Curated annotation (Swiss-Prot):
<dbReference type="InterPro" id="IPR018170">
    <property type="entry name" value="Aldo/ket_reductase_CS"/>
</dbReference>
<feature type="binding site">
    <location>
        <begin position="216"/>
        <end position="275"/>
    </location>
    <ligand>
        <name>NADP(+)</name>
    </ligand>
</feature>
<dbReference type="InterPro" id="IPR036812">
    <property type="entry name" value="NADP_OxRdtase_dom_sf"/>
</dbReference>
<dbReference type="GO" id="GO:0019853">
    <property type="term" value="P:L-ascorbic acid biosynthetic process"/>
</dbReference>
<feature type="active site" description="Proton donor">
    <location>
        <position position="58"/>
    </location>
</feature>
<dbReference type="Pfam" id="PF00248">
    <property type="entry name" value="Aldo_ket_red"/>
</dbReference>
<protein>
    <recommendedName>
        <fullName>D-galacturonate reductase</fullName>
        <ecNumber>1.1.1.365</ecNumber>
    </recommendedName>
</protein>
<dbReference type="InterPro" id="IPR044497">
    <property type="entry name" value="AKR4A/B"/>
</dbReference>
<dbReference type="InterPro" id="IPR020471">
    <property type="entry name" value="AKR"/>
</dbReference>
<keyword id="KW-0060">Ascorbate biosynthesis</keyword>
<dbReference type="GO" id="GO:0102098">
    <property type="term" value="F:D-galacturonate reductase activity"/>
</dbReference>
<feature type="binding site">
    <location>
        <position position="121"/>
    </location>
    <ligand>
        <name>substrate</name>
    </ligand>
</feature>
<comment type="pathway">
    <text>Cofactor biosynthesis; L-ascorbate biosynthesis.</text>
</comment>
<comment type="function">
    <text>Involved in ascorbic acid (vitamin C) biosynthesis.</text>
</comment>
<keyword id="KW-0560">Oxidoreductase</keyword>
<keyword id="KW-0521">NADP</keyword>
<dbReference type="InterPro" id="IPR023210">
    <property type="entry name" value="NADP_OxRdtase_dom"/>
</dbReference>
Length: 319
């Protein structure tokens, strides 16, 4: 079983919290059937994954909860405390009075008493009637960061979440949040990979003590919205051949060497294990230099999901 390092999160109030640097993502489109998802999560636990990333919007919280219960029954883990669980507040419920009911619904789905990291999923508020995307402009509203964050802090104070964070937040949004936060965000989860390196935003987060977690670290390859700009890179392929590793392993190692944790998703048993096997080598200065010059392009924009509305384009411009 692979041994995965952990990172200490510095923005968790008075608590010291550690998080495994590689987490298994559980989003899939179209959504995987529950039995397939549960089997994959159990296999991931056997392989050594201890961090699992889900969200209310993914529809995978119940699958993860049932898999955790089964892992306990099978004694793959001795206690729920061995796992680090991240889930997210969906944008349709991103208002002060809905945060507490939302985390309680997630806790029920997951069959756990606390969440390790509760994250604001999107930097917008969506109307509750949203069922399909793109959406009309009036259904995309500015996020009331102050009131929502106060409710997130309450989740932590009540012990329902051990850490709280954000996702897809720009530096200006983080500046606003930090100006009033009693408990600063522990993480900012962002799309990041060798083909979208986000150095300026990462440097900002580091200076503020906010840890960055990368989603789509392989460019969302093999999905309808991703492409092969990472796994198909000639430069990454050249480095992979020289090291006897896969292009995915080189890409994940690069993300890790930036001081960033990773959420990667595969339900393939072999790839699942390969994605953990990145801690027995390092990239050379020459290799890092080559990768720093890869062509840069963001994989998914909010405008491509929600529509080219002014509020959406403004966030895309900063990310």
């Amino acid at each position: 079983m692979a041994k995965v390092p952990s990172v200490t999160l510095s923005s968790c109030g008075d608590d010291i919290q550690t998080m495994p640097v590689i987490g298994m993502g559980t989003s899939s489109y179209p959504r995987a059937d529950p039995e397939t998802a549960k089997a994959a999560i159990l296999e991931a636990i056997r392989a050594g994954y201890r961090h699992f990333d889900t969200a209310a919007a993914y529809g995978s919280e119940k699958d993860l909860g049932e898999a955790i219960a089964e892992a306990l029954r099978l004694q793959l883990i001795k206690s729920r405390d061995e796992l680090f669980i991240t889930t997210k507040l969906w944008a349709s419920f991103a208002e002060k009075d809905l945060v507490l009911p939302s985390i309680k619904a997630s806790l029920s789905n997951l069959q756990v008493e606390y969440i390790d990291m509760y994250i604001i999923h999107w930097p917008f508020k969506l109307g509750k009637e949203v069922r399909t995307m793109p959406v009309e402009r009036d259904l995309v509203q500015p996020l009331d960061i102050k009131s929502v964050w106060e409710a997130m802090e309450e989740c932590k104070k009540l012990g329902l979440a051990r850490g709280i964070g954000v996702s897809n937040f720009t530096s200006s949004m983080l500046e606003e949040l930090l100006s009033f936060a009693e408990i600063p965000p522990a993480v900012n989860q962002l799309e990041m990979n060798p083909a979208w390196q986000l150095k300026k935003l990462r440097d900002f987060c580091k200076a503020k003590g906010i840890h960055v977690t990368a989603y789509s670290p392989l460019g969302a390859a093999r999905t309808k919205w991703g492409d092969d700009r990472v796994l198909g890179s000639d430069i990454i392929e050249e480095i992979a051949q020289a090291k006897g590793k896969s292009t995915a392993q080189i890409s994940l190692r690069w993300v890790y060497e930036q001081g960033v944790s990773i959420v990667t998703k595969s339900y393939n048993k072999e790839r699942m294990r390969q994605n953990l096997d990145i801690f027995d080598f390092c990239l050379t200065e020459e290799e890092l230099e080559k990768m720093s010059h890869l062509p840069q392009r963001k994989g998914v924009t909010f405008a491509s999901i929600l529509g080219p509305h002014d509020i959406v384009l403004e966030v895309d411009e900063e990310l």
